[in-house]
């Protein structure tokens, strides 16, 4: 798994000295923003890269959740004033995946409502089991991909009707006219235009990835006139990771590990993910 590498020397960047360490220019994710990573049987790490292992978990369980949990924690709590509060409604893309399953549990623990977006009924029911208030099967809608040209009235009009139909599916859960306070985004290209539209006035679309593509499009008018916030988010600070880990130690968040692969089966695990045939939740490689 990726490990978080914190700066080891004093920096002139104020964000490293009492500000947000994730905004420090020296901050890099080991193996993602550096040439060499931790994808090996053995790696040597620094003391500040470690968090306490929950005593009730196996090593496999303990090794499978931190990347997605800490990322989800920062997305939901790291960008004030748009932080998770009780009774909020949060739309969670990919609810049965790594980020989504962690987000659902954090949202549930906060007394808020997670609405999972999934691709099958089976995955939706699993999201309900871990704490989602409800789920929406995205295969019942056809509003995915880049935003059609707003100058093409026919194409844009048809697209907007479908997005509004998706929005009404949200209202069936939250109540008429009640849009998500936060949209938990990571697919990117295929879903971002919809996220920017369905988020409530003054709400936030927070995203940490572009798993379906990096070319994000949206109708700017709905963002500026309704004063919505589009917020990028990248992993987590040590403090945020520690706080997230305590939610596991306290039993409020489960690691959700479904399969364990031997090290030589890594190609199989990657193939399953590439084909979207993996079981819901986390994997662990030993």
Predicted regions and their residues:
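Short, small-residue-biased leader/transition segments that mark boundaries at the very start
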Residues: 2-11, 286
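NAD(P)H dinucleotide-binding glycine-rich loop of Rossmann-like/cofactor-binding domains
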Residues: 12-94, 140-143, 150-152
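Hydrophobic/small residue at the entry helix of a nucleotide-binding pocket
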Residues: 71, 98-99, 190-191
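Helix-to-beta-strand junctions that scaffold the AdoMet/dcAdoMet cofactor pocket
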Residues: 85, 199-200
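NAD(P)H cofactor-binding loop motif with strongest signal on the N-terminal glycine-rich segment
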Residues: 94-95, 187
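Adenosine-nucleotide cofactor-binding segment
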Residues: 108-190
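C-terminal hydrophobic helical "lid"/dimerization subdomain
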Residues: 193-197, 238-284
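Rossmann-fold dehydrogenase core element
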Residues: 201-208, 218-257
């Amino acid at each position: 798994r990726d490990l978080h590498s914190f700066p080891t020397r004093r920096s002139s960047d104020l964000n490293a000295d009492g500000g947000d360490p994730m905004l420090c220019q020296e901050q890099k994710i080991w193996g993602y923003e550096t040439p060499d990573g931790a994808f090996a049987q053995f790696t040597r790490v620094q003391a500040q890269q470690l968090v306490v292992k929950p005593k009730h978990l196996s090593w496999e369980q303990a090794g499978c959740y931190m990347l997605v949990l800490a990322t989800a924690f920062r997305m939901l709590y790291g960008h004030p004033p748009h932080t998770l509060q009780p009774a909020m409604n949060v739309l969670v893309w990919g609810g049965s995946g790594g980020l989504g399953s962690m987000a659902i549990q954090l949202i549930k623990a906060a007394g808020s409502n997670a609405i999972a977006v999934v691709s099958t009924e089976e995955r939706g029911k699993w999201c309900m089991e871990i704490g989602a208030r409800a789920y929406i099967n995205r295969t019942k809608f056809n509003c995915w991909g880049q935003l059609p040209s707003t100058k093409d009235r026919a194409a844009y009009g048809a697209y907007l009707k479908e997005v509004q139909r998706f929005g009404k599916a949200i209202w069936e859960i939250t109540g008429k006219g009640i849009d998500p306070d936060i949209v938990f985004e990571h697919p990117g290209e295929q879903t971002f235009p919809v996220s920017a539209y369905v988020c409530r006035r003054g709400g936030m679309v927070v995203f940490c990835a572009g798993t379906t593509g990096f070319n994000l499009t949206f109708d700017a008018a709905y963002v500026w006139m309704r004063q919505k916030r589009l917020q990028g988010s990248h992993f987590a600070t040590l403090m945020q990771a520690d706080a997230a880990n305590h939610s596991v130690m306290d039993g409020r968040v489960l690691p959700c590990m479904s399969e364990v692969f031997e090290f030589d089966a890594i190609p199989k695990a990657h193939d399953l993910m590439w084909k979207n045939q993996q079981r819901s939740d986390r994997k662990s490689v030993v």
